[in-house]
From Swiss-Prot:
Record-stated family: Belongs to the G-protein coupled receptor 1 family.
Membrane-spanning parts: 38-64, 70-93, 111-132, 155-174, 198-223, 248-270, 288-308
Ranges of the Extracellular topological domain: 1-37, 94-110, 175-197, 271-287
Protein name: C5a anaphylatoxin chemotactic receptor 1
Disulphide bridges, residue numbers: 109-187
Intervals, Cytoplasmic compartment: 65-69, 133-154, 224-247, 309-350
Gene that this polypeptide is encoded by: c5ar1
Keywords annotated in UniProt: Cell membrane, Chemotaxis, Disulfide bond, G-protein coupled receptor, Glycoprotein, Membrane, Receptor, Transducer, Transmembrane, Transmembrane helix
Tissue expression pattern: High expression in head, kidney and posterior kidney, lower levels in peripheral blood leukocytes and spleen, low expression in brain and gills, heart, intestine and very low expression in liver and muscle.
Topology in membrane: Multi-pass membrane protein
Compartments where found: Cell membrane
Functional note: Receptor for the chemotactic and inflammatory peptide anaphylatoxin C5a. This receptor stimulates chemotaxis, granule enzyme release and superoxide anion production.
Length: 350
């Protein structure tokens, strides 16, 4: 593979803020990691440790412990996408720990970056789908009763994954492993300036602005309908339910905004900051942290969308109790078997 500094133009080097041509040490992979890079690694590690068990538990409960329904299919696919997001974190931590050196080869570079955006798009689209489903349930309940079926929901989920694949095609096409020096290579998207701005703008509009507007609007309609119906039945119960709905709406909207907005803003800052700027290194590190913050949304989704539901909490409590009882019974059985075996051995020796 040719040296990157010789095959890329000055415009492309400036576009990606590549300073490695000047600063990579001939004998190694770059400078020693500083406190900020270590903080980013710790942040990634925490998201991995929290996100994997939480989403794996949701996948297990919605996939194997709950009756098949439209809602369980939404949450199963959302948890599966979030679980895959969190499982990819160690592969992103390795280049971060090696000063952005990519050690996995060109095929893994293209596949990982493409699948990463596919899964992230899928997670966002599923959040929009869940919001639209709640909107339809309160706006057209009769239509939902006639047409809202698990089989149709399964095909909708397939369509969501295909749309996410369509949105991630640029990553599969343009991302490549490039050699910066004899001892360092990076996994980068080799766009032109025009295509980079177009791709980033489209990702911002389709991956953040439209989903955020949809999520907020749908949940606000749900809250308005719930508050309008709070006049029916016991006042305190209805008022408490309305407040609970409002808290969920605020939590869902804020988590989506706070987790995704910084990443999209920093995408634009990375493109607009000259590579010789004194702020370039800090912006790159901030972009790394913003990407991890977007992963935090995968940790929060099980709590916000699933665990707040009473039916799910009952199923998860029942499942955990069954697991605990099974482990306890198995331990007792092993102890009794060991005890009886020891007694028989002693009798034979007497």
């Amino acid at each position: 593979m040719d040296d990157m500094c010789s095959i890329l133009t000055e415009e492309e080097l400036s576009l990606y803020n590549i300073t490695d041509c000047e600063f990579v040490k001939p004998g190694g992979l770059g400078p020693v990691l500083g406190p900020r890079h270590l903080s980013a690694l710790v942040f990634y590690g925490l998201v991995f440790l929290l996100g994997v068990p939480g989403n794996a538990l949701v996948v297990w409960v919605t996939g194997f412990r709950m009756p098949r329904s439209v809602t369980s299919l939404w949450f199963l696919n959302l948890a599966l996408a979030d679980l895959l997001c969190c499982l990819s974190l160690p592969l992103l931590m390795v280049p971060l720990a090696m000063d952005q050196h990519w050690p996995f080869g060109p095929v893994a570079c293209k596949l990982l970056k493409g699948l990463l955006y596919l899964i992230m798009f899928c997670s966002v689209l599923l959040l929009v789908l869940i919001s639209l489903d709640r909107f339809l349930l309160v706006s057209w309940p009769v239509w939902c009763q006639n047409w809202r079926r698990p089989r149709k929901a399964g095909w909708v989920c397939v369509g969501v994954w295909l749309l996410a694949l369509l949105g991630s095609i640029p990553q599969f096409v343009y991302v490549k492993e490039v050699q910066l020096s004899t001892s360092k290579s990076e996994c980068l998207g080799l766009y032109t300036v025009a295509s980079a701005w177009a791709n980033t703008t489209a990702r911002f509009l389709v991956g953040f602005v439209l989903p955020f507007i949809t999520i907020v609007t749908c949940h606000w309609v749900v809250y308005s309908r719930a508050r309008r119906g709070s006049g029916v039945g016991p006042g305190r119960v209805s008022e408490a339910r309305s407040r609970r709905t409002l808290r969920v709406i605020v939590a869902v909207s804020l988590s989506f905004f706070l987790c995704w907005f910084p990443l999209h803003i920093l995408d634009f800052l990375v493109l607009s900051t000259p590579r010789h700027s004194s702020h370039s290194a800090n912006i790159q590190l901030a972009h790394t942290l913003a990407l991890c913050l977007a992963y935090c949304n995968s940790c929060l989704n099980p709590l916000l969308y699933v665990c707040l539901g009473r039916g799910f909490k009952q199923n998860i409590n029942r499942s955990l109790r069954n697991m605990f009882n099974f482990a306890t019974e198995e331990s007792v059985t092993r102890q009794s078997m060991f005890k009886s075996t020891s007694e028989r051995t002693q009798e034979m020796n007497m």
